[in-house]
């Protein structure tokens, strides 16, 4: 044969590696800071205001309940020695029930806050994700890394494009 088997293998490998090298040179990567983008979105500001208002209302309700419990507890402690045993036991049971309702209210308030957060923020994050995908497709990048969510200790700006401004533009944010 004109070519030896070893030379043929080297030639085949070079032909396989050459396109990979050319392909690797065309890879484009991007990165963003999602927190910078989200915090500039009007939808985020509105959602945060609603969450703060709900948190304030729940906090006031809890405080009112705690003050009522504290008042009844102090009254009970002042009167317990002068109350008949049956009445003292009934009031103590009422206090225990109040305490249990308070704990249930606190747990429910926490669940309500989490649900409200999810409900209000889901559309914000969907809008952000849609904008990221649109910019990624328009820029022809393979990946867009979120520097706010993924701790990447080093980004070579010559190899990775900062797409934060373009995502903001896509969202109509300055």
Functional labels for PLM-detected ranges:
Residues 1-11:
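Single conserved hydrophobic/aromatic residue that forms the stacking wall/gate
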Residues 24-174:
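Amphipathic, charged alpha-helical segments and their helix-to-coil junctions
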Residues 11-12, 22:
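Cleavable N-terminal signal peptides
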């Amino acid at each position: 044969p004109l070519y030896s088997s070893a030379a043929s293998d080297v030639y085949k490998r070079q032909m396989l590696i050459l396109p990979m090298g050319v392909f690797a040179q065309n890879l484009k990567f991007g990165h963003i800071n999602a927190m910078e983008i989200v915090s500039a979105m009007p939808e985020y500001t509105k959602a945060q205001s609603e969450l703060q208002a709900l948190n304030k209302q729940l906090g006031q309700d809890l405080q009112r309940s705690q003050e009522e419990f504290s008042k009844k507890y102090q009254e009970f402690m002042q009167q317990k020695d002068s109350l008949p045993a049956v009445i003292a036991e009934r009031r103590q049971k009422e206090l225990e029930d109040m305490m249990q309702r308070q704990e249930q209210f606190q747990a429910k308030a926490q669940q309500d806050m989490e649900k409200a957060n999810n409900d209000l923020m889901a559309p914000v994050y969907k809008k952000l994700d849609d904008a990221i995908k649109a910019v990624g497709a328009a820029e022809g990048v393979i990946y867009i890394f979120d520097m706010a969510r993924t701790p990447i200790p080093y980004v070579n700006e010559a190899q990775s494009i900062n797409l934060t401004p373009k995502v903001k533009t896509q969202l109509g944010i300055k």
